[in-house]
């Protein structure tokens, strides 16, 4: 699933509204070259490396190595290595860490649920609802589908689903 640049730009703007990491700027270390690795503490289903690479690219960093979303990780596995100026590494670090922490966990839990359901009935599927935190849908859907679950309904425009409150206006 492709997550639009505009969505990633919103994540960046919400974390770095002024466009600089003030601490790195004040310390005068922004131009120093660096290397950073992301690794996991627990077994997990990876989600978000493609988007993290695009975020770091906006800050002048390059991805030296990265596993693709959907990879199974064991504790201690390094799944992404990024190189670039300290300013870029610091600006991308926390945004991407939050993506990894939340959406690897969601993908992993979805996978566990799908595996548990399929152990009982391989023909049964796990479906997600539209009850998502506002603004999180792109990553939620990506993580859930990586975990093997399916979105029941992505939006109001794709299917007809009549609730009691619709019937109130319909006359019955």
What are these regions (language model features)?
Residues 1-172:
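Acidic/glycine-rich phosphate/pyrophosphate-binding loops and surrounding catalytic core
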């Amino acid at each position: 699933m492709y997550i639009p640049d505009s969505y990633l730009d919103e994540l960046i703007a919400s974390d770095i509204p002024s466009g600089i990491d003030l601490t790195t700027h004040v310390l005068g270390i922004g131009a120093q070259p660096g290397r950073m690795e992301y690794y996991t503490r627990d077994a997990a289903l990876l989600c978000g490396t493609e988007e993290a690479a695009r975020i770091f690219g906006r800050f002048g960093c390059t991805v030296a190595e990265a596993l693709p979303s959907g990879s199974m990780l064991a504790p201690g596995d390094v799944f992404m290595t990024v190189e670039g100026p300290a300013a870029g590494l610091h600006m991308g670090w926390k945004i991407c860490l939050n993506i990894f922490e939340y959406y690897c966990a969601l993908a992993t839990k979805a996978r566990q649920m799908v595996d548990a359901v399929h152990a009982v009935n391989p023909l049964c599927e796990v479906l997600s609802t539209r009850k998502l935190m506002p603004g999180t849908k792109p990553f939620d859907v990506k993580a859930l589908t990586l975990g093997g679950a399916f979105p029941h309904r992505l939006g109001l425009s794709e299917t007809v689903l009549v609730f009691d409150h619709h019937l109130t206006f319909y006359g019955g």
